[in-house]
Amino acid sequence: MRSLLTSTLKTSFTAFLVFVGVFTHAQSGYSFKFNEQELRNKSNLAIEVPDGNYTVKIRLGNADRSTLTTVRAESSRLLLNNIVTQKGEFKTFKFTVNKRDKFITPDETVQLKTRELDKKNWDKYLSLAFDGEQAGVHSIEIKPNKKAITVFLCGNSTVVDQDSEPWAAWGQVIPAFFNEKVSIANYAESGESSNTFLNAKRFEKALTFMKKGDYVFIEFGHNDEKQRGEDKGAYKHFIKSLKVYI
C-alpha cells in the first residue's frame, strides 16, 4: 500500500501548511499538479511558487501503522532516504529545496535540451515526491528561506539530477547530507562541457540568484576532451572557460 496523507493547504505571505487527510484543490493562488501514472508508484505534491529557496518541515509517521518513507524534490533530488517509524511514532525533519524555472528575464531563457523540457527542475512548481512501501506523511510546512547558503552545481552527467531510475549522479544525492541551512541548486546536465554550459546560459541563470556566502562547484572535463579544433579540448577551451567561471 502506498499513500500520502495530506489535505488542506493553508497559505499566508510567509508559509503554507499541508495537514493530514487527502489532497484538495489550490487555495490562495497556489496550485497543484498531478501525474496520474506517477501517482500509481509514488505520491507527488507540486506547488506553484516563485524561484528561490524553500525550507520544508516535514513530519513523518502514522498513528495506526508503521511507515517507510523516502522524500525527493524536483527531478529526483534525494532529501530523506528510507525513514522508518513504528506505529504511533512520528519523526520531524527539515531541509531546504532550491526551485527555479528557465527564465532569466521575461524575454530571455536558459537554452534547454529537448529532454529537459518536461523536467521538474525547470518548471514553475516546487515538487516533492514521497515514496516507500508504507510511505506516511503527517504534515508539511513550507517557508521561503532567503538566508540559506546556496551551493550551485555546474557539471555534466556525473553531477546531473537523473530523474529516471536506475541512473543517478552524486549531485542529486548530496542534498541528503545537509541540513536546512544549505540548499543545493543543481544546474548540471548530461553532455555539457565547460563552454556549452556557458553558451546555454545556465551559469547566467545561476548568477541571478548568487549572493555573498554562496558556493559554486564546477565539474567538467570528460566532455571537453572530446572536442576537436583550434582552441578546443581539455587543455585550451576548458582553461579559457574556467577563467570565465572564476
Regions picked out by a protein language model, each given a short descriptive name:
Residues G52-I58:
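A short tyrosine-centered beta-strand micro-motif
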Residues Q27-A46:
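Glycan-recognition and processing domains
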Residues L60, D64-L80:
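Short, surface-exposed beta-strand/strand-loop-strand elements in extracellular ectodomains
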Residues M1-S28:
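Bacterial Sec-dependent N-terminal signal peptides
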